[in-house]
Amino acid sequence: MLSAADNLVRIINAVFLIISIGLISGLIGTQTKHSSRVNFCMFAAVYGLVTDSLYGFLANFWTSLTYPAILLVLDFLNFIFTFVAATALAVGIRCHSCKNKTYLEQNKIIQGSSSRCHQSQAAVAFFYFSCFLFLIKVTVATMGMMQNGGFGSNTGFSRRRARRQMGIPTISQV
C-alpha cells in the first residue's frame, strides 16, 4: 500500500491532468489544421493519468505492484512526457497577449481565436504544475530506492539494516 502523502499527490496530479485533458480536447475540437504538438499534449496527459492514477489506485490494493523501481520509472517517464508537452506547447504558442490580433492570426496552434489562446496558455500552466509534482515524486522515489532498494528489500544504503545477532541470545530470541 502506498503512503497517504503519495496518494494525496496522485489525486492532486490527477486533477491537474484531467483539467489539461479538458483544455487540450477543447483545442482539438476547435482546430481547423492538424497540430502534432496539441496531439502530443493529449497523449502525455492521458498517459500520465493512466500510469500515475490508475497504477497508484491498483497499487493500493495489490502490494505486489508497489515496487519502488517500477514507480520510479513510471514517474520519470511521466515527468519527461509532461515537461516535453508543456514546453512544446509553450514554444508553439509563444505565450503573447491574447488581445494581440497579429499574434492570434499568425499562430498555427491558436488559429486566430482568443479562446484557443486562453485554453492553450492554461494548458501550459497545468502541464507545468503536473510536471513539478512528477519531479517531486521522482525525487522521493529515488530517495526511497536508496534507502530500501529497488524492489523493497534492504539492499540499498539503508541506515535501518538488520544488526547481526552475536553473543548470548536474549529472552525474546528464545
UniProtKB/Swiss-Prot annotation:
Induction: By ketoconazole. the promoter contains a sterol regulatory element motif, which has been identified as a UPC2-binding site.
TM region positions: 8-28, 42-62, 70-90, 123-143
Keywords in alphabetical order: Cell membrane, Membrane, Protein transport, Transmembrane, Transmembrane helix, Transport
KW Lyase (keyword) present: no
Alphabetized Pfam families for the sequence: MARVEL
Main location: membrane
A GO CC term attached to the entry: plasma membrane
UniProt topology in membrane: Multi-pass membrane protein
One annotated GO biological process: protein localization to plasma membrane
Domain of life: Eukaryota
Location(s) in or outside the cell: Cell membrane
Extracellular side: 29-41, 91-122
Sequence ranges on the Cytoplasmic membrane side: 1-7, 63-69, 144-174
InterPro entries in UniProt: Marvel (IPR008253), NCE102-like (IPR052649)
Family designation: Belongs to the NCE102 family.
Biological function: Involved in membrane organization. Required for the formation of membrane compartments of CAN1 (MCCs), localization of CAN1 at the MCCs and subsequent invagination of the plasma membrane at the MCCs sites. Involved in eisosome organization and might act as a sensor of sphingolipids that regulates plasma membrane function. Involved in a novel pathway of export of proteins that lack a cleavable signal sequence. Non-classical export pathway also functions as an alternative clearance/detoxification pathway to eliminate damaged material, when the basic repair pathway is not sufficient.
Protein name: Non-classical export protein 2 homolog 1
